[in-house]
Design a protein with these regions (language model features):
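Basic, polyanion-binding surface patches
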Residues: 1-157
Length: 157
């Protein structure tokens, strides 16, 4: 681990089974299926942001994001966030999501009502891998949610 890397949170299975996540970068929201765990110790995930996506610019600017695992009952709003552009509209306000301060992140806020949340900071961008997607290794710096797997209602894909 490089000296400038943050202390990562302990691994958590709050996201199992694999599911569609709702990502926040700053105050912007987007649904994401292109993610996976790449390390348990240190706890890291891989995110793939579409090239040209407004959230990609925000991720490069803020170097942080949050990954939310929303209940099945929120699936319509989560999916709808992918049809709106954060360049033109405040998605949280338009879709009725409540944003809360993060524990460790400076500019990115958290979505109320998530069954689990991972606070993430950029470890590195993987360059020259894809023309369509920008892959990022993200360090998990905080984990929220302790709902047992049998009590969760995930948005599976």
């Amino acid at each position: 681990m490089y000296p400038s890397q943050p202390q990562t949170a302990a691994f958590s299975s709050v996201f199992f089974p694999q599911q569609v996540a709702l990502i926040t970068v700053g105050d912007n929201l987007l649904p994401m299926g292109y993610w996976t765990v790449v390390s348990k110790e240190p706890f890291r995930v891989l995110l793939l942001m579409g090239v040209g996506n407004h959230s990609l610019g925000l991720l490069k600017k803020h170097k942080e994001a949050a990954m939310h695992f929303m209940p099945w009952s929120e699936r319509e709003r989560v999916v709808r966030a992918g049809y709106l552009s954060g360049r033109n509209v405040n998605k949280a306000e338009t879709l009725g999501f409540t944003l809360l301060p993060a524990e460790k992140l400076k500019t990115t806020r958290l979505v109320a009502g998530a069954e689990g949340i991972l606070e993430l900071v950029v470890n590195r961008e993987l360059l020259n891998i894809s023309r369509e997607f920008a892959p990022f290794i993200m360090d998990v710096v905080a984990v929220h949610g302790d709902i047992s797997p049998d009590q969760r209602h995930p948005i599976l894909y």
